[in-house]
Amino acid sequence: MEILNENYNEWRIYYLEKEFLSLGKKLTDESEIDVVEVYKESQRNYVAKIKFNNKYYVLKSPRNEYRIPQRRFATLFKEGEALTTLKNITELRNRGLVELVAPLLVVVRRTKGMIKESYIVFEFVEGEDGRNHILEMIQAGEKMHSLGTYHGDFNPSNFIWTKNGMKIIDTQGKKAWTPLKQRYDLITLDYDNIDDFDRYAKHKKDFWFHLALLLKKYKRNSIIEKIKKWKKKKRDQGWRI
């Protein structure tokens, strides 16, 4: 499916179907959007369930991308998280990874070449998280890996079991240049989320596994975790770090 785009005032709208162009224009004025439920609202991100033309969708804004100076500066040279996600996931779905929840629309506003604000709209899916469907969750993740990509936050809350099977959410669908991130996906599921991983799958204990395991242990180091929490707290207080 081809991604179309159009300028609208200060915004650039990217969409898959013409019907979403009008939604994109409405997103430039948040007061016109029918917000059904806000799932998350912080200085870091915004996630909400919205209604448009009698259908439900999920609206997200990666605020961290444009509130942290170094990340905002980097958008001079990048397409941004929202547009990258739209392109990556659309390509992966075209290649058969229909388990990925479909992104439908992106709106981006830039000033001086840097992203000032952006939103992405996904289809809405209902179901339960993957905790009771570990095997199907692992199979969906391994299908991602087979296409040369990785999830990046491989935990049950990002896999939704629906009446149509497993759906994958909250990923940018980035390319895995080496197996490191793919090994890290499964280590995250095993070490952080479930107690009986070996019932469902086996780790491929190669060089990349051991490197990913070392990285996981580094990130779980108490000192590193304290530094991350301190930085998050200060950013939420308005510090530009």
Where on the chain are the PLM-derived regions?
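ATP-binding glycine-rich loop module of kinase domains
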Residues: 34-37, 43-83
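Catalytic-loop of the protein kinase fold
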Residues: 149-156
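Short hydrophobic-acidic sequence motifs that mark active-site Asp/Glu residues
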Residues: 49, 56-60, 121, 168, ...
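Juxta-kinase regulatory segment immediately upstream of eukaryotic protein kinase catalytic domains
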Residues: 1-37, 225-240
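Conserved structural core of kinase catalytic domains
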Residues: 78-83, 90-93, 100-135
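Protein kinase catalytic-loop region centered on the HRD/HxD motif
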Residues: 143-149
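C-lobe/activation-segment region of protein kinase-like
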Residues: 150, 165-241
